[in-house]
């Protein structure tokens, strides 16, 4: 019989496995931000990975639609994998409107899919962690989303970051002034590439793709290059002369002033949030304030949290107008950044202690010790074989167990354990399980 050829184990480009250490780091990150969300009153929901294509296609930009994983299923239905969690949220809200009270604050954590070029910090399957405030037109809800971004990054131990903010109404207004109102979506799509391709390439695309004059292209880019360098008061004074250019621009600037009236009263570091008129957000459903968050130490990795207001998102599903504002944390990109910054804990186990014995006759007692420790609130793992301490300690060291509870003949007879601190090498011989638990909880 011909020997069957072995399959080479491999993953697709842009898709990845996670070894325990990385998977645990991701789990800790998600637990941390979930606690922040719930501290603001957000509740979890879940939506399917697979949606009818028509639900996703209408709301995504042209660029997003090119990256969509779309196919016909076995039943001949035109379906697609979700590219974000905001469009499924619009469908969810419209479908379950009667079961939800408004305003509704939700968060959702799950994988999304985009067929973009894979590179550092960018994957084709990646986890998004979204939080949204539905049913409120108040600028206060915009301010709260920004507050949640700030609190989440601080909870993860990140001190220096910048939340760059803009308003689509301001961008719409400047496009109107330069006579390209009908091409606003295309103009914003190209401006959104500014950090990726640079000023001259943006001007070239505006001129060659959209037919703008050099004067209009440079005028739009000149305005979008304005950034807040110092206090908000100085910046608003600097751009006040632009407000007369259009009603939309004036309205957008008024909203930014109202936003700052709230943000500046909070105990947030003002260096962490600034206005940047080049922030456009490529997704077509944003209608008001938009923002992107970059890490000051790693700006090249891109935005780790972005979002904005989308007052018309449910219009494809319902005649009822539904306001919303939210943001999305790019979990995989943020994990890559945290690793590069040395902020990820390096343990490969969740257990606080490894229980290990030296003789087969002591194995049952090992499981009893671990059971008792768990009832006392200690995450405990049992080494499943009787081995010499050198071997069990090497295992604990490789996995990152902080402590090892060693069981030998004396420990079995007395109903105690010997507790070894793996970091400092200290050892507490023959102490009670309760005493060991106190040290472990310590």
Curated annotation (Swiss-Prot):
Keyword Amino-acid biosynthesis: no
One record GO biological process: histidyl-tRNA aminoacylation
Main location: cytoplasm
Cystine pairings recorded for this chain: none
Domain of life of the source: Bacteria
Reactions mediated catalytically: tRNA(His) + L-histidine + ATP = L-histidyl-tRNA(His) + AMP + diphosphate + H(+)
Pfam families in alphabetical order: HGTP_anticodon, tRNA-synt_His
GO molecular function: ATP binding; histidine-tRNA ligase activity
Gene Ontology cellular-component annotations: cytoplasm
InterPro entries, sorted: aa-tRNA-synth_II, aa-tRNA-synth_II/BPL/LPL, Anticodon-bd, Anticodon-bd_dom_sf, His-tRNA-ligase, HisRS-like_core, HisRS/HisZ, HisRS_anticodon
Annotated PROSITE patterns: AA_TRNA_LIGASE_II
Protein location: Cytoplasm
Keywords attached to this entry: Aminoacyl-tRNA synthetase, ATP-binding, Cytoplasm, Ligase, Nucleotide-binding, Protein biosynthesis
Record-listed E.C. numbers: 6.1.1.21
Enzyme's top EC category: ligase
Annotated family: Belongs to the class-II aminoacyl-tRNA synthetase family.
Oligomer status and interactors: Homodimer.
Name of the protein in its database record: Histidine--tRNA ligase
Organism for this UniProt entry: Wolinella succinogenes (strain ATCC 29543 / DSM 1740 / CCUG 13145 / JCM 31913 / LMG 7466 / NCTC 11488 / FDC 602W)
Encoding gene per record: hisS
